[in-house]
Amino acid sequence: MTTRVIYPGTFDPITNGHLDLIERAAAMFDTVIVGVAYNPTKKPLFDLNERVALAQSVTQHLPNVEIVGFSGLLVNFAKEHNANVLVRGLRAVSDFEYEFQLANMNRRLMPELETVFLTPAEENSFISSTIVKEVALHKGDVSQFVPNQISQALNKKLFA
């Protein structure tokens, strides 16, 4: 039996923390589908197509990783892709309560959907897309927090 998992997120932009979790999930599971979410309540810096392309550009070395944009309920996306496991990252205890609520709601909506939590490598535990964008907006160097092509895309988007 092959295990298809979904690692969902906005990825605006994808960071070293995200990439760390994707690489680790790819080592544990047969197929990892990175679900790049369109959420109408969020105002991302990069549009959905840009976020998908950026995620693809930094995961090319992982043959069992697919990048797919989606909107709507995550459980419907999981069903469409025959996935029965969600991978979520927990940076700190403060993430746990919200993630626990989401996991229980997803389980209620799709009982066969399991959620697996991964903690980031210590050097990535404080990185968030929001903080990276804030640093980049103020012309700070984000190269230690995101892959090179993401740093370039941020600079182009913010200052071109």
Swiss-Prot record:
User: At which residues is there a site annotated Transition state stabilizer?
Assistant: H18
Reactions mediated catalytically: (R)-4'-phosphopantetheine + ATP + H(+) = 3'-dephospho-CoA + diphosphate
Q: Which NCBIfam families match?
A: coaD_prev_kdtB, cyt_tran_rel
EC number in record: 2.7.7.3
UniProt protein name:
Phosphopantetheine adenylyltransferase
Function summary: Reversibly transfers an adenylyl group from ATP to 4'-phosphopantetheine, yielding dephospho-CoA (dPCoA) and pyrophosphate.
Q: Which residues form a coiled coil?
A: none
What is the organism field in this record?
Answer: Photobacterium damsela subsp. piscicida
Q: Which residues does the record give as ATP binding sites?
A: T10, F11, H18, G89, L90, R91, E99, N124, S125, F126, I127, S128, S129, T130
One annotated GO biological process? coenzyme A biosynthetic process
- Does rRNA-binding count among this protein's keywords? no
PANTHER family in the record, alphabetically?
PHOSPHOPANTETHEINE ADENYLYLTRANSFERASE
Its annotated pathway reads: Cofactor biosynthesis; coenzyme A biosynthesis; CoA from (R)-pantothenate: step 4/5
What UniProt keywords are attached to this protein's entry?
A: ATP-binding, Coenzyme A biosynthesis, Cytoplasm, Magnesium, Nucleotide-binding, Nucleotidyltransferase, Transferase
In its UniProt record, a GO molecular function of this protein is: pantetheine-phosphate adenylyltransferase activity
What positions does the entry give for substrate binding? T10, K42, L74, R88
The record's note on quaternary structure and interaction partners says: Homohexamer.
Q: Which family does it belong to?
A: Belongs to the bacterial CoaD family.
Q: Does the keyword Magnesium apply?
A: yes
